[in-house]
Amino acid sequence: MPISNFIKRKLAMAFYLFDRDKNGVLEEEDFVQLGAAVANLQGVPAESERYRKIVAAHRGWWDAYFKGGDADGDGKITLEEYVANVDRWAATTPEPIAAAAAGNELVFDTIDANGDGTLSADEFSTYLQAYGLTDADARTAFAHLDRDKSGSISRAEFAKNMAEYYLSESRGPSEWFYGGH
């Protein structure tokens, strides 16, 4: 079954946030720049191992989730290619939300700046500011995504929210992952 317009809108919002140079397509360099922005906003020195890991994780996100959707092999992903790739992946993956949640836990470590296993409002805000959101919008998103209202987002909450953002037809907290739409 093709994905709905609701999910297409969420995918489009994420697509335009990932497009760091605003050229209308996603390329590997967008993810390198995104990783660098996350590290810089966290105050991680550019020559450090943590900086390299953050950039590598975002480059890995390109390799794992985006590169395979390049239908014409030009090294660029259009919005149409992106939506078609997510649709194809969701249709052919058993338990797609659970599978996506498992993969999304890898991103968590790049955001968890203090390594305590949870995301604070400050850490999550810094992450979303790398995408271009304001601190206020990021904190509003955090309030929605902190499902148990503990004041932090656990690894499981993060992975579930991100997976549901991309794949769930249901309205709820996950639609706030990138600041609402």
Language-model-detected regions and their locations in the chain:
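Conserved GNAT-fold acetyl-CoA-binding loop/helix
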Residues: 45-53
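C-terminal interaction modules of eukaryotic adaptor/scaffold proteins
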Residues: 162-165, 173-177
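Short helix-capping and inter-helix turn/linker motifs at the boundaries of alpha-helical repeat units
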Residues: 2-6, 56-57, 97-99, 131-133
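Short, structured interface segments that constitute the first stable element of a domain
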Residues: 89-106
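Amphipathic regulatory helices of Ca2+-sensor modules
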Residues: 27-46, 77-92, 118-132, 154-168
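The feature marks the first
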Residues: 2-44
